[in-house]
Amino acid sequence: NGADDNASGVSALLSILEEFHHSKTAPKRSIIFISFSAEEEGLLGSKYFVNHLPVAKNAVKVMINMDMVGRLNDKKELYMGGAGTFPDGVELMKKLGEGSGLNPVVFAGDVGGSDHVTFYKNDISAIGLHTGGHPQYHTPEDDTALINSEGGALVSKYIYNALVSIANYEQPLTFIKQN
């Protein structure tokens, strides 16, 4: 069924796009919104994109990946790896948690294994966000009845705020190699 993996990420992407549309936000840097396919087959969509970028590679500063963001737990933990791949990223992602209703669990490294890894391996800063694993992962039981819609809204708002903050970063956004 794929409700969490990864209809939840697509839903977050659409919510964030809608928020940008309504807010009329004009960030300092451009933002490319994209949804990849064939992640399970070896990150084929993200690999193709990185190998055929529509802009110069040095113009791509940070990739934020939302994969499995629909099952926010009772502790409201939003996990992310790769926050240390750009300057002050860990601090920013933690600070964005203040007043968000979420408890960000932020790792400088631990980049993970989803589409953002393709960017990281090509020296582009990358953060992967998720709300945690569950027994329904990669099973037909990954159904909409188990999605935490209110949690998904909190996660989408957090990611929107992260995008705006990163796009308006005053300092240069440079790649920092992690583990």
Question: What does each of the following model-derived ranges do?
Answer:
Residues 1-3, 74-77, 139-142:
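Short acidic, glycine/proline-rich loop/turn micro-motifs
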Residues 36-135:
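Metal-dependent peptidase/peptidase-like ectodomains
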Residues 26-38, 63-66, 169-179:
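Acidic/histidine-enriched alpha-helical segments
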Residues 5-12, 45, 89, 115, ...:
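Catalytic-loop motifs flanking and including active-site residues across diverse enzymes
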Residues 1-6, 79-84, 106, 146-151:
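Short, contiguous acidic/charged loop-to-helix segments that flank catalytic cores in large enzymes
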Residues 11, 18, 22, 135-179:
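His/Asp/Glu-rich mid-to-C-terminal helical/loop segments that flank catalytic regions of hydrolases
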Residues 15-25, 51-55, 94-98, 102, ...:
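Sec-exported extracytoplasmic/periplasmic mature domains
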Residues 1-42, 159:
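Alpha-helical metal-binding/catalytic segments enriched in His/Glu/Asp
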